[in-house]
């Protein structure tokens, strides 16, 4: 899981 932060 990769979140756009």
Swiss-Prot record:
Keywords: Amidation, Amphibian defense peptide, Secreted. The keyword Secreted applies. It comes from Litoria rubella. One of its GO terms (biological process) is defense response. One of its GO terms (cellular component) is extracellular region. It comes from the Eukaryota. It is found in: Secreted. The modification Methionine amide is found at residue 5. The lineage of its organism: Eukaryota, Metazoa, Chordata, Craniata, Vertebrata. This is Electrin-3. Expressed by the skin glands. Its main location: secreted.
